[in-house]
UniProtKB/Swiss-Prot annotation:
Protein name in the entry: NAD kinase
Annotated localization: Cytoplasm
Molecular function GO terms recorded: ATP binding; metal ion binding; NAD binding; NAD+ kinase activity
Cofactor: a divalent metal cation
A GO biological process held by the record: NAD metabolic process
Family in the record: Belongs to the NAD kinase family.
Originating species: Burkholderia pseudomallei (strain K96243)
Source organism, top-level taxon: Bacteria
Main location: cytoplasm
Amino acid sequence: MKIGHQFHTVALVGRSNTPGIAEPLASLAACIAKRGFEVVFEADTAQAIGSAGYPALTPAEIGARADVAVVLGGDGTMLGMGRQLAPYKTPLIGINHGRLGFITDIPASDMREVVPMMLAGSYEREERTLLEARIVRNGEPIYHALAFNDVVVNRSGFSGMAELRVSVDGRFMYNQRSDGLIVATPTGSTAYALSSQGPILHPQLQGIVLVPIAPHALSNRPIVLPDDSKIAIQIIGGRDVNVNFDMQSFTALELNDTIEVRRSKHTVPFLHPVGYSYYATLRKKLHWNEHPSSEEDDDA
């Protein structure tokens, strides 16, 4: 068993527009408070579920006051809160109340048993990297964003292919005609990048992956770069090209705009139950080894 820091103030975050989430959040809050922890709620979550009796805080206030944030929702909720809390190094615990649950790894049915043990110090910790990106137009930055999973440059559904000029560390890599290009973290390698035939990167691998989306030339393949690489993607052709960050914020691009992407100085601590295995997550979520030869193999 790995014993870590015991927490005092716990922030609860939920996907506020999800039907049926109020009861499990209230139940978890009561369970945690009964064990002597101070419980606060993220403000939008508190408003949506009517969490009377608990302080309601903005993400910035959570970062300044809470020792840990427990997120009940899907991967998107976890990504959004991770980006907002990244500057504060607030650890995150993810409870899956969505569909896939790659990064919300605790089943909701187990939360009342597992979460209190983790808050008492029984957990495994890992750091997840983020990307920071900026859009440069006519030599001036016009937009900045963080991305937990990926930065995606792509065409709209009704326009032709995008033409992109890609450079790494100031050196020309290639011109590419495609539906777009994904720049992904190891965490994001199991998201959109995976569906575009990109490789899976272990979360502790120091890398950034570039994955073309439906490239015109079959020789345009994914490539893994060192995570200190500085990537520049210039729009040199195409109509209605845009860029999105974790599929949660979007910006329209113009000809000759450049998207500059690099690893963020921020990392986000993820906390897992003792015995957590990334390989078990892959096996379960991607349906690997559906007919294991033994129970021992299945539990590894």
